[in-house]
C-alpha cells in the first residue's frame, strides 16, 4: 500500500507531548491520529463502547473498548484497543462518567491504532521508520 509510509511514519516531534506527572510515556493528542488517518487516504471505521463496573457501590464507567477497521480499497485489518479511567477521577465529583468515557475512548482509539502500527514508536521508544531501521542495519 503506498499509503503505508504516510500512515505509519513516526509522528513529528513537535506533535509529541510530555506525559503528565505520574503517567508513563509521551503521547500524541487524539486529533492528530484522526488527521493522520484522514490524510493518508485510507478509510476507517471506529466503534467504541463503555466498560462498566461497581465503584463505591455505584455502577460507573471505568473504561472503554474500541474497535478500528482500516481499509485501503481492500480490508486491511480490525484491531481492538482498551482505555481505562484513573481511579482518582472516580472519586472526584469534578470528573463525571461522560468526561471519563471521553478520556478512556481516546486511549482506546490510540491503542487500537498502535496495534496497526500508527503511533507505535510512542510505545516502543523508536522513532525510526521500518525503512530507516533496515537501511541503518545494512550499514
Predicted feature locations:
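Interfaces that engage single-stranded nucleic acids at replication/repair/recombination sites
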Residues: 2-3, 18, 130-139
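Positively charged, aromatic-enriched nucleic acid-contacting surfaces
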Residues: 31-137
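N-terminal, Lys/Arg- and Ser/Thr-rich interaction peptides
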Residues: 1-31
Amino acid at each position: 500500500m503506498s499509503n503505508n509510509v504516510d500512515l505509519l511514519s513516526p509522528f513529528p516531534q513537535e506533535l509529541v507531548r510530555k506525559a503528565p506527572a505520574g503517567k508513563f510515556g509521551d503521547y500524541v493528542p487524539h486529533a492528530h491520529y484522526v488527521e493522520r488517518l484522514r490524510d493518508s487516504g485510507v478509510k476507517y471505521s471506529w466503534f467504541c463502547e463503555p466498560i462498566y463496573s461497581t465503584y463505591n457501590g455505584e455502577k460507573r464507567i471505568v473504561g472503554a473498548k474500541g474497535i478500528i477497521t482500516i481499509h485501503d480499497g481492500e480490508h486491511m485489518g480490525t484491531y481492538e484497543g482498551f482505555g481505562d479511567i484513573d481511579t482518582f477521577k472516580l472519586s472526584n465529583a469534578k470528573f463525571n462518567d461522560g468526561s471519563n468515557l471521553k478520556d478512556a475512548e481516546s486511549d482506546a482509539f490510540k491503542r487500537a491504532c498502535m496495534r496497526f502500527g500508527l503511533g507505535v514508536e510512542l510505545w516502543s521508544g523508536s522513532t525510526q521508520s521500518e525503512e530507516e531501521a533496515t537501511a541503518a542495519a545494512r550499514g
